[in-house]
Amino acid sequence: MEFSVKNGSVEKQRTACLVVGVYEPRRLSAAAEQLDKLSEGYISTLLRRGDLEGKAGQTLLLHNVPNVPADRVLLVGCGKERELTERQYKQIIQKMVQAVSETGSMEVVCFLTELHVKGRTSYWNVRFAIEAIQESLYSYNDFKSIKPEVRREFRRVIFNVANRKDLADAERALEHGKAISTGVAFAKNVANCPPNVCNPAYLAELAKGLAAEYDNIRTTVIDEAEMAALGMNAYLAVSRGSQNPAYLSVIEYKNHPNPDAKPIVLVGKGLTFDSGGISIKPSDSMDEMKYDMGGAASVYGTMKALAEMKLPLNVIGVLAGCENMPDGNAYRPGDILTTMNGLTVEVLNTDAEGRLVLCDTLTYVERFEPELVIDMATLTGACMIALGAHNSGLMSTSNVLANDLLNAAEQADDKAWRLPLGEEYQEQLKSNFADLANIGGRLGGAITAGQLLSNFTKKYVWAHLDIAGTAWKSGVAKGATGRPVSLLSQFLINKANNQ
């Protein structure tokens, strides 16, 4: 898909399909008003006759509009002008995609980017439009022997901005929107891949692929022998029951003007399949446990977006690849594990494995002397119960970092909600036989999981994103979401802008 921006007059657009908005009730947007004048009231006459009310998502395709050089004019309902939100705007763009795809048009000139979205600028309108279009066109059919009939997709979208002075921002939005959409798609592809293909070795190969593609990326893969030498016993315990060995993939992106600048480190839980181990999960929906590597997928997608945007930062992405399976060699409830930093953990439930993989990974990344560390993981069902499928759970030992992430989440429309940490939650992690227990009981399960991780982050600024509710969708819309690639990408954009 080719995207571009311009500042032009709606009356002069020679294109296969010209798209303008109509507000509710039957109110023309500025671009639609200009077309109506050019067509001598043709559009307003149709609205008076009741052909389109202007409710959000309604569409009306017109051919041969008098005096208009475009082959087609698509009217898109935008709802009430003063109530247009980011969510509604994206839905409107996706309705446009659906309608245009049924016409056979190869090119679209879109004036919907001129709409006023609450608290947003032309930059956001263009970027959100690209993200919404790419989201709408995404499909994953790699393993279907009979491919679905592919609709004839348009190949080019030209976004119009109302003011010439906004063109530079719109061009920047193009760059960011395309890069972030690519990162989201890469994350979704990896997460949707079946676990008999996507195992820890597969994640390691993907990480190596980034290094082969980009000159400023270097990848190092840590195997189980090296993990054992490092004392990563908690990580290795989780892997013991699987025939697929664990691999820790370290992706180093260096593009800061100061090559010695401290890196931002992103850590992703990469459980390519989580059966629960000896504490085995119920069979219902166990197939969705291929998504337990959603954290690693989002780090991979973010590193891809980062490289495409060429941001002047030093960033390290870490994919903690592992598989949790039951067999005669699997770790057990009651086992006590000595972690890389020396703390011991009693295993009360082998299905609380992600935190064991992460605690050693979070210790491992100390060697990079990071500016900050953000880990993301499909960690707890408790977070899904608390926040549902709309907000990722955020925990942090730093108010500054937490606020920066919440700001990026709001900007990117990739929402997060902060949950507390504190010594009172540490009490729930007490063990009679070890320094820590790997679960803290039913109450506050998402928080106690984050609190456990905090014991391994004392040497740097840290935040944790629990994406168990946001990394994928179930039911008829089953599939990975690519979250929180947009949030992380925006966080990195902000970091680059403010240094």
Curated annotation (Swiss-Prot):
This is Probable cytosol aminopeptidase. Mn(2+) 1 binds at residues 274, 351, 353. The lineage of its organism: Bacteria, Pseudomonadati, Pseudomonadota, Gammaproteobacteria, Pasteurellales. One of its GO terms (biological process) is proteolysis. Its EC number is 3.4.11.1, 3.4.11.10. Binds 2 manganese ions per subunit. The active site is at residues 281, 355. Mn(2+) 2 binds at residues 269, 274, 292, 353. It is found in: Cytoplasm. Its cofactor is Mn(2+). Its main location: cytoplasm. GO terms for molecular function: manganese ion binding; metalloaminopeptidase activity. Keywords: Aminopeptidase, Cytoplasm, Hydrolase, Manganese, Metal-binding, Protease. Presumably involved in the processing and regular turnover of intracellular proteins. Catalyzes the removal of unsubstituted N-terminal amino acids from various peptides. GO terms for cellular component: cytoplasm. It catalyses: Release of an N-terminal amino acid, Xaa-|-Yaa-, in which Xaa is preferably Leu, but may be other amino acids including Pro although not Arg or Lys, and Yaa may be Pro. Amino acid amides and methyl esters are also readily hydrolyzed, but rates on arylamides are exceedingly low; Release of an N-terminal amino acid, preferentially leucine, but not glutamic or aspartic acids. It is an enzyme of class 3 (hydrolase). Belongs to the peptidase M17 family.
